[in-house]
UniProtKB/Swiss-Prot annotation:
This is Ras-like GTP-binding protein RHO. InterPro entries: P-loop_NTPase, Small_GTP-bd, Small_GTPase, Small_GTPase_Rho. It comes from Aplysia californica (California sea hare). It comes from the Eukaryota. GO terms for molecular function: GTP binding; GTPase activity. The modification Cysteine methyl ester is found at C189.
């Protein structure tokens, strides 16, 4: 039986952990060096609920320089991972300000999984000290859940690519969401 093919696109601010999350899931190794993304695609096989799914993983660059290029990733998307970093309250603020409007515009009706990356930094002392200097604190789980509700996300999950905690769960949930969407002949994302 042929595998079911689904397309996942990951979005979020630059340096919020998108590429690391994809690399840890698809290659099971954590990249120690930060390399800003242009566009990288991976394919990963995942089994959920007894179904074999070939998940095409589309990485995107969060930096503003790529705002005009990023929409090229959106056509025929089945599920969106919308990421922020737990050590960056500003990246959470950009979820309703920037990412939700962009995704809803290009991918109406595509399920969104809101993902809090870098969970391991929530209790990291040096991270907390740095944030305190700016009168901020790491994003709390309830803030993430409230945001997921606000943007009408399919689900809210937290993970750490570094420790691998929660990583598989993110992709299993995303795959389930993608499988639930019944595509019309022309459905999916549109580029206008």
């Amino acid at each position: 039986m042929a595998a079911i093919r689904k397309k996942l696109v990951i979005v979020g601010d630059g340096a919020c952990g998108k590429t690391c999350l994809l690399i840890v899931f698809s290659k099971d190794q954590f990249p120690e060096v930060y390399v800003p993304t242009v566009f990288e695609n991976y394919v990963a096989d995942i089994e959920v609920d007894g179904k074999q799914v070939e998940l095409a993983l589309w990485d995107t660059a969060g930096q503003e320089d790529y705002d005009r290029l990023r929409p090229l990733s959106y056509p025929d998307t089945d599920v969106i991972l919308m990421c922020f970093s737990i050590d960056s309250p500003d990246s959470l603020e950009n979820i309703p300000e920037k990412w939700t409007p962009e995704v809803r515009h290009f991918c109406p009706n595509v399920p969104i999984i809101l993902v809090g990356n870098k969970k391991d930094l929530r209790n990291d002392e040096s991270t907390k000290r740095e944030l305190m200097k700016m009168k901020q604190e790491p994003v709390r789980p309830e803030d993430g859940r409230a945001m997921a509700e606000k943007i009408n996300a399919y689900s809210y999950l937290e993970c750490s690519a570094k420790t691998k905690e929660g990583v598989r769960d993110v992709f299993e949930t995303a795959t389930r969401a993608a499988l639930q969407v019944k595509k019309k002949k022309k459905g999916g994302c549109v580029v206008l």
